[in-house]
């Protein structure tokens, strides 16, 4: 993916002295391209550190994002500096051998970045279509295998020219040109862009269809599970159920639906974020992969060198803007970025995986009216957590201290309005753990664990109902 320098296409077998460098142009290009490279390097390092330093981001999906950032980091740190020097000087100053190696690394990193987006799109399709089965389908071992396949496939695409699959090299070593051998151009364009693009678009079209269908069900206030014929309302009602098997089965079904609802909402938000990444990828790389085959197969229609340079650097730009997309479209990454940069927010830091609010109806008031005396537990920074365990349709809320020395129980006032904090510690389809406690908990006290019968739960994420 290296463009021609000067009039190399017309005199590739002749050696010319390098043209004098325009100082003002060199300074301007140096500032612009140097700033772009520095931004790309620091941004991708920030993405990697954000995932590495936050345990709640240690998931297979985020490992795929880290792999994308690694490919972009390698491109911006090892390829783009030489591309910038090439552009500023107007000729290649590093010899023929390094030109070939540099071009191969360029193709390797660009292909790995694109294939990583392809893997991410497949991951999002599985996450949105099968939110409860996702942890068993996408395991860490399978994720690692996928990452190895990404780099193996990228290596296969990139090493062809090193073994002679290219047009004859010019005698002038100040010329480092793109490999225009038609067979390799077709092979690399299909493998590096068009096949991954087809998969990406197919996956996101499917994600859009599934998300639209699920969202339509949520907006109507009803949710039907594929494995059951009964419809369950969005707001899950829990009442004292008989000890018989039917009551237990009903409670299990409702718990299943509520967790599925929550997981689907989170997967849909992740798909939106990565959908923006894919959209920017298409806008950045499509012009290059249109221009390159045209110039190779139809030399008479080869675009001017200036046009080729623009679309070439537009493709490079994609590796620099991904770190902007994450914090702008994902609150999760925004908070992680802020923590890494040690930016003090107006709100207290939350170590939760995802903020979750609960609206509760106390048993004594639930029958008097749906909204009367409804207790809202907003998101906060309490230092206690509860685990929800269910027996016969009744949820037990057990309050513990999360102090380092152990888990001491604390007092929860009978007046539930005094409870002012709630946040999620961890979530899986087996349990939900949250931070809940009074405004000024006293971890030193040890009292009987209270049990609260929940008649209605309304789940919300970041202030939005799910």
Swiss-Prot record:
- Report TM segments: 26-51, 64-89, 100-122, 144-168, 182-205, 273-297, 305-329
The entry's protein name is: Alpha-1A adrenergic receptor
List lipidated residues, S-palmitoyl cysteine.
Answer: 345
- Coiled-coil positions: none
Location within or outside the cell: Nucleus membrane; Cell membrane; Cytoplasm; Membrane, Caveola
UniProt-listed Pfam families: 7tm_1
Membrane-related topology note: Multi-pass membrane protein
The UniProt entry's GO biological process terms, in alphabetical order, are:
adenylate cyclase-activating adrenergic receptor signaling pathway; adult heart development; cell growth involved in cardiac muscle cell development; MAPK cascade; negative regulation of autophagy; negative regulation of heart rate involved in baroreceptor response to increased systemic arterial blood pressure; neuron-glial cell signaling; norepinephrine-epinephrine vasoconstriction involved in regulation of systemic arterial blood pressure
| Keywords carried by this UniProt record | Cell membrane, Cytoplasm, G-protein coupled receptor, Glycoprotein, Lipoprotein, Membrane, Nucleus, Palmitate, Receptor, Transducer, Transmembrane, Transmembrane helix
The UniProt function text for this chain reads: This alpha-adrenergic receptor mediates its action by association with G proteins that activate a phosphatidylinositol-calcium second messenger system. Its effect is mediated by G(q) and G(11) proteins. Nuclear ADRA1A-ADRA1B heterooligomers regulate phenylephrine (PE)-stimulated ERK signaling in cardiac myocytes.
Q: Which residues lie on this side of the membrane: Cytoplasmic?
A: 52-63, 123-143, 206-272, 330-466
Which SMART domains has this protein been placed in?
Answer: 7TM_GPCR_Srsx (SM01381)
Tissue occurrence: Abundant in liver, vas deferens, brain, and aorta, but not in heart.
Any single GO molecular-function term of the entry would be: protein heterodimerization activity
| Family matches, as PANTHER family | ADRENERGIC RECEPTOR-RELATED G-PROTEIN COUPLED RECEPTOR (PTHR24248), ALPHA-1A ADRENERGIC RECEPTOR (PTHR24248:SF16)
**Which positions does the motif Nuclear localization signal occupy?**
334-349
Cellular component terms, GO, for this chain's entry? caveola; cytoplasm; cytosol; nuclear membrane; nucleoplasm; nucleus; plasma membrane
Q: Which family does it belong to?
A: Belongs to the G-protein coupled receptor 1 family. Adrenergic receptor subfamily. ADRA1A sub-subfamily.
Q: Which cysteines are joined by disulfide bonds?
A: none
> Which residues lie toward the Extracellular compartment?
1-25, 90-99, 169-181, 298-304
């Amino acid at each position: 993916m290296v463009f021609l320098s000067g009039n190399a296409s017309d005199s590739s077998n002749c050696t010319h002295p390098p043209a004098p460098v325009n100082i003002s142009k060199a300074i301007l290009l140096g500032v612009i391209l140097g700033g772009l490279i520095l931004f790309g390097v620091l941004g991708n390092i920030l993405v990697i550190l954000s995932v590495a330093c936050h345990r709640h981001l240690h998931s297979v999906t985020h490992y795929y994002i880290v792999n994308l950032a690694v490919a972009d980091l390698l491109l911006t740190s090892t390829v783009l500096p030489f591309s910038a020097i090439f552009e500023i000087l107007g000729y290649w100053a590093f010899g023929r051998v390094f030109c070939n190696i540099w071009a191969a690394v360029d193709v390797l990193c660009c292909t790995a970045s694109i294939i990583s987006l392809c893997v991410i799109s497949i991951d999002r399709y599985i996450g949105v279509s099968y939110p409860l089965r996702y942890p068993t389908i996408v395991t860490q071992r399978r994720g690692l295998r996928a990452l190895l396949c990404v780099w193996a496939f990228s290596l296969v695409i990139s090493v062809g020219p090193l073994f002679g699959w290219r047009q004859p090299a010019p005698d002038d070593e100040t010329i480092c040109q793109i490999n225009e051998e038609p067979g390799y151009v077709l092979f690399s364009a299909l493998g590096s862009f068009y096949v991954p693009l087809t998969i990406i678009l197919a996956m996101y079209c499917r994600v859009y269809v599934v998300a639209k269908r699920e969202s339509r069900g949520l907006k109507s206030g009803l949710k039907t599970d594929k494995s059951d014929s009964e419809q369950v309302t969005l707001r899950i009602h829990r009442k004292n159920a008989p000890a018989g098997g039917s009551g237990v089965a009903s409670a299990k079904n409702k718990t299943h639906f509520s967790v599925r609802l929550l997981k689907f909402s989170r997967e849909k938000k992740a798909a939106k974020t990565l959908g923006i990444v894919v959209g920017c990828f298409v806008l950045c790389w499509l012009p290059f992969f249109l221009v390159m085959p045209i110039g190779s197969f139809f030399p008479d229609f080869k675009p001017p060198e200036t046009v080729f340079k623009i679309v070439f650097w537009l493709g490079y730009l994609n590796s620099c803007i991904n770190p902007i997309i994450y914090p702008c479209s994902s609150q999760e990454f925004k908070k992680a970025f802020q923590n890494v940069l040690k930016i003090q927010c107006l709100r207290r830091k939350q170590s939760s995986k995802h903020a979750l609010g609960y609206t509760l109806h106390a048993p004594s008031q639930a029958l008097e009216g749906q909204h009367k005396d409804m207790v809202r537990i907003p998101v906060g920074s309490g230092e206690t957590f509860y685990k929800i365990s269910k027996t016969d349709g009744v949820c037990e809320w057990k309050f513990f201290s999360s102090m380092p020395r152990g888990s001491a129980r604390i007092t929860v006032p009978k007046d539930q309005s005094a409870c002012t904090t709630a946040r999620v510690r961890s979530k899986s389809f087996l349990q939900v753990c949250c931070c809940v406690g009074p405004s000024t908990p006293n971890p030193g006290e040890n009292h009987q664990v209270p049990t609260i019968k929940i008649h209605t739960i309304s789940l919300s994420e970041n202030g939005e109902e799910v």
